[in-house]
């Protein structure tokens, strides 16, 4: 049985998205003036429904530089048609890789390396003014002359990442909402390898995981590289081991990895390259959990297809199902010999690397056209996803979208832009919010940034937000400890938790070692389970009418419990620390009694939750 996500209630919505957005694929919606060479288009939607767009081009005489525009949920530009262009710094004549992130306080941050070799971050308020001045903030003590990345925090600040190709270092720091800098973190290698292509995903408690590549030159343009992950807190403390996700491979330096958060504090990682098993090119999937530990044992990764040397499987883009937390990955297939075929596939993976749709599902068949710019987004409440792609002759193209349900079956097909012309598409998606997603592109023939909205049913223009599903709250304070009765020589684990409100239909207790799933009545908030000495992992969910919750968390933030039941020869340690303050008493069935005084109890077996002499909260079984 798959674990399901606890759905967060969205605010009630009483309006319908309409106004400027059009329902005509032949016209679309004008968003900003751009030159014909504009590119590197990024898009991000704020919690309030406004969307920021960033593109790069030669403008204002200061080199290849970013420009930004803000639109509301109706598709109406909120700034001048030329957008906002930070022009304080002189930029190089090429792109080192710019970044953009919408912040939780409704602003936007852009980050870039200047021609002088410094990394700069600039924050722009919703009204177009500069929160930190147009000059922005110089990061990393002046280091970092190459590509940048940004990740929004939960308090209006951002994580920023910079790269020094010259030194082979990655630099990371957290910028507070007011522009205050936290300590710079340097990721480097003592043996002389380069640390490159850092990407960031959120870790619990507003921390960050950095997924990066360690590489050293092999020959010509080939490098031996592996993929690693390491976690940090805002004050620069390393919070997880530096873990290898992918074994070293010798591949072209241009093949780099991508990441997508799994919604549980970890992330999926994927990369396509020609050096592994299967086709001449294949896409490989990895995963790490909220502790930064790899959950896929094969360090070669799991391929989207098994053995198929006659075909390439590449150009992937992925999303995560918000309910099951599975990875949904879309990718292009073409024949190895002539590369004349073009199909779009999707496949599904869980966190252990199980390929749930076997060899994938074809969602766009070969039709003599080239399919490119593949993107994918899950519906905001699950139940399906949208695959976006362009279709054309490789230069002129149209924009299409296809709705797919959880079984991989097409449910709708929409042409978003029907006029065929050369275009540069956005590099990412903004995700569904209130039932709406947005695609954007630059018209390479005449210039101009254009966009189109689309709903969960493939509709454009007027979109009615969906009704949020009933929330699935998990239990909390999942605790437990070992128990041993020397008279009967019976050992057990005693578990307890705090019930969610409202109560579920029942709880599911997952016993990892025995692969059992035990159903527990909703009236109980503790459970006694006999086990032989050994180490046991338990997980707990709440089961509702329409969904199953996320796993319950322990007081220290883990979504599982490890109970060590010692051998019978050493069990005296279990009872040594006596309970001095009884908090709650349950009967053997897990029902809470109305007393915390043992003397008030009738004869029988009870479970006591209390505080010991050392201040530890424990759960123990007694016979009255």
Where in this protein do the model-derived segments appear?
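Bacterial Sec-dependent N-terminal signal peptides
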Residues: 1-21
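Extracellular, repeat-based ectodomains that mediate carbohydrate processing or recognition
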Residues: 20-466
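Short strand-edge motifs at loop-to-beta-strand transitions and within beta-strands
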Residues: 525-527
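Short beta-strand segments within Ig-like beta-sandwich modules, predominantly Fibronectin type-III
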Residues: 517-523
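C-terminal outer-membrane/trafficking sorting elements
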Residues: 18, 506-516, 532-537, 564-624
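Short glycine/proline-centered coil/turn motifs in the loop regions
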Residues: 60, 115, 393, 489, ...
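Pro/Thr/Ser/Gly-rich low-complexity, intrinsically disordered linker/stalk tracts
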Residues: 466-502, 547-566
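Beta-strand-rich modules
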Residues: 529-548
